[in-house]
Amino acid sequence: MVEALLSGIVLGLIPITLLGLFVTAYLQYRRGDQLDL
Protein backbone atom coordinates (compact mmCIF):
# COMPACT_ATOMS: atom_id res chain seq x y z
CA MET A 1 0.00 0.00 0.00
CA VAL A 2 2.78 2.42 0.94
CA GLU A 3 4.81 1.54 -2.16
CA ALA A 4 1.80 2.22 -4.39
CA LEU A 5 1.25 5.57 -2.67
CA LEU A 6 4.90 6.57 -3.08
CA SER A 7 4.96 5.48 -6.72
CA GLY A 8 1.78 7.50 -7.34
CA ILE A 9 3.30 10.58 -5.71
CA VAL A 10 6.51 10.22 -7.75
CA LEU A 11 4.59 9.71 -11.01
CA GLY A 12 2.53 12.79 -10.15
CA LEU A 13 5.53 14.98 -9.28
CA ILE A 14 7.66 14.12 -12.32
CA PRO A 15 5.41 15.83 -14.94
CA ILE A 16 4.92 18.84 -12.64
CA THR A 17 8.69 19.15 -12.14
CA LEU A 18 9.37 18.84 -15.87
CA LEU A 19 6.67 21.42 -16.62
CA GLY A 20 8.12 23.80 -14.02
CA LEU A 21 11.62 23.46 -15.47
CA PHE A 22 10.31 24.00 -19.00
CA VAL A 23 8.36 27.12 -18.00
CA THR A 24 11.33 28.51 -16.05
CA ALA A 25 13.71 27.93 -18.97
CA TYR A 26 11.20 29.50 -21.38
CA LEU A 27 10.76 32.59 -19.20
CA GLN A 28 14.54 32.97 -18.82
CA TYR A 29 14.92 32.63 -22.61
CA ARG A 30 12.25 35.28 -23.22
CA ARG A 31 13.79 37.61 -20.60
CA GLY A 32 17.29 37.17 -22.07
CA ASP A 33 15.93 37.73 -25.57
CA GLN A 34 14.25 40.96 -24.48
CA LEU A 35 17.35 42.25 -22.66
CA ASP A 36 19.57 41.44 -25.64
CA LEU A 37 18.44 44.44 -27.67
Swiss-Prot record:
Entry annotated with the keyword Protein biosynthesis: no
One annotated GO molecular function: electron transporter, transferring electrons within cytochrome b6/f complex of photosystem II activity
Keywords, sorted A to Z: Chloroplast, Electron transport, Membrane, Photosynthesis, Plastid, Thylakoid, Transmembrane, Transmembrane helix, Transport
Membrane topology designation: Single-pass membrane protein
Transmembrane segments: 5-25
Subcellular localization(s) per the UniProt record: Plastid, Chloroplast thylakoid membrane
Superkingdom in the source lineage: Eukaryota
KW Manganese (keyword) present: no
Gene Ontology BP term (one): photosynthesis
GO CC terms of this entry: chloroplast thylakoid membrane; cytochrome b6f complex
Pfam families: PetG
Coiled-coil annotated spans: none
Function: Component of the cytochrome b6-f complex, which mediates electron transfer between photosystem II (PSII) and photosystem I (PSI), cyclic electron flow around PSI, and state transitions. PetG is required for either the stability or assembly of the cytochrome b6-f complex.
Family assignment from sequence similarity: Belongs to the PetG family.
Subunit structure: The 4 large subunits of the cytochrome b6-f complex are cytochrome b6, subunit IV (17 kDa polypeptide, PetD), cytochrome f and the Rieske protein, while the 4 small subunits are PetG, PetL, PetM and PetN. The complex functions as a dimer.
Name of the protein described by the UniProt record: Cytochrome b6-f complex subunit 5
Organism listed in the record: Marchantia polymorpha (Common liverwort)
Gene behind the chain: petG
